[in-house]
Amino acid sequence: MSAIALDRAAVRVAVDGRPAPKILLEELTVRLTEQRIGIIGANGSGKSTLLRLLNGLVVPSSGTVTVDQWDTVRSVREVRRRVGFVFTDPLSQLVMPTGREDVELSLRRSVKNARERSRQAEETLDRFGLLPLADQSIYELSGGERQLLALAAVLAVDPEVLVLDEPSTLLDLRNRELLRRTLAGLSQQIILSTHDLELALDLDRVLVVDAGAVVFDGGPAAAVAHYRALCAAGLAASGAAADAARPGWPHSENPHLENPGLENPGLAPQRPGQL
């Protein structure tokens, strides 16, 4: 399994009219080693920024991010061969007219024989129940079908790590269950953000992100309870991170998180080989 490490990584951006940069992600030191990791939080909390650090789509303003010792800035090609990324909006990464062509494009670098490439593409599409739709225009597919196609195209090249940004957002109940079963059967390390708290409960470890900071890191049940408490208190994405850092709140239960200010109140288109 891949070892992903953030060492004092932070993301800041300049904003016109503001004397100081806007902080998208507070400085964070953490190791991501579990098989299935989730990131939960309100819209705008910093979930996507954190995920995009993991394969070099976002460059840290300070600190470093490494995947198996490969730096995401200096060795971005090596990182992207290992880390597959699925966006919330599948049209951000589906670039061919049909699903068949898109999956075959993903395989082009690793599978040189056209017949074998076609066979593997069909096998991948069938795995997701998409083979009957393989030759339809991607614009004729539903949002959920496009999302499954984007996932299929990334998995076709067998990345070591699969990063998914809110993968169930566009899926109906049937396809959400298909997604959950598919993820459960994968050998890859999975790191995903989600608003689907039932999906979060399937994971090994969950981080709660609020206002650009990780405010909880631990088991899924405790993390979901923590996030629900933030939402009930009206704190999520509105300064809860500052509240969570005040003295007297218990520390995160996860020993991988190394942030002395992180405490909790006791209560988750680039393809591998393409650049």
Model-predicted segments: where are they?
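Conserved ABC transporter NBD signature motif
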Residues: 63-74, 79
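Conserved ABC ATPase "signature" region
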Residues: 115-133
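Conserved beta-strand-loop-alpha-helix hinge in the C-terminal portion
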Residues: 213-237
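The feature captures the beta-strand-to-loop junction immediately N-terminal to the Walker
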Residues: 40-42
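Catalytic Walker B motif of ABC-type/P-loop ATPase nucleotide-binding domains
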Residues: 162-166
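Conserved ABC ATPase signature
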Residues: 137-141, 145
